[in-house]
């Protein structure tokens, strides 16, 4: 199901949400107890207003990887916990994609307090992409403190989701080319901030010099 379809379905009611799991191949789980437990976990999550599509995906992944029934059940239970924490931290959002991104960030080791802070900074805008980039940066080797600080600065500056996504791609490419993860994050985030500052000055009627191009290997300006 596409993102728009999931959002439309989740807006209906918990009973509509639980219908998302109807196509899940539960019968491929040969342990009846685990099968029942997983169904119950997903039904309970739906009753709480949590998105079930990430849970269904987790079950499918476990089946595809031939994980044991207990491992699939445990993984599903842990994801329910993360979705609950993300829902609390990112309130009042009910976006399936945003809550899933929050759950991924928690799994990457980002504390719930960071999610709450990001929501305060962007109270009316979706955090799906910024959260996804934060998770990817930490997973790519950027220290949590550097990744969090830089993402926070970009939120304050008003970076767009497209700018977040582009920066994330550039950081990954820089790391693949041999640049240290923290240096890549510092370099690329400063490039975005430089552009945002330039755009703000133009909007205010100033005539600033064009921002210098940022290239891999260029030492970040202090």
Model regions and ranges:
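Bacterial N-terminal signal peptides
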Residues: 2-14
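General marker for long, soluble alpha-helical cores
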Residues: 18-222
């Amino acid at each position: 199901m596409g993102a728009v379809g999931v959002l439309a379905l989740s807006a209906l009611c918990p009973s509509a949400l639980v219908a998302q799991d109807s196509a899940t191949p539960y019968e491929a789980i040969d342990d009846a107890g685990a099968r029942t437990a997983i169904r119950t976990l997903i039904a309970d999550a739906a009753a709480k207003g949590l998105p079930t599509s990430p849970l269904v995906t987790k079950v499918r992944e476990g089946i595809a990887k031939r994980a044991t029934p207990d491992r699939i059940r445990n993984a599903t239970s842990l994801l329910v916990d993360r979705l609950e924490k993300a829902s609390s931290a990112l309130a009042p959002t009910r976006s399936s994609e945003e809550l899933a991104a929050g759950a991924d960030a928690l799994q990457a080791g980002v504390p719930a307090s960071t999610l709450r802070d990001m929501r305060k900074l962007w109270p009316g805008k979706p955090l799906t992409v910024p959260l996804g980039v934060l998770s990817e940066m930490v997973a790519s080797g950027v220290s949590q403190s550097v990744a969090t600080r830089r993402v926070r600065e970009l939120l304050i500056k008003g970076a767009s989701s497209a700018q977040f996504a582009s920066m994330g791609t550039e950081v990954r490419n820089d790391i693949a080319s041999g640049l240290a993860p923290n240096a890549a994050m510092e370099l690329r985030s400063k490039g975005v901030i430089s552009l945002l500052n330039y755009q703000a000055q133009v909007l205010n009627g100033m005539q600033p010099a064009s921002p210098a191009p940022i290239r891999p290997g260029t030492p970040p300006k202090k």
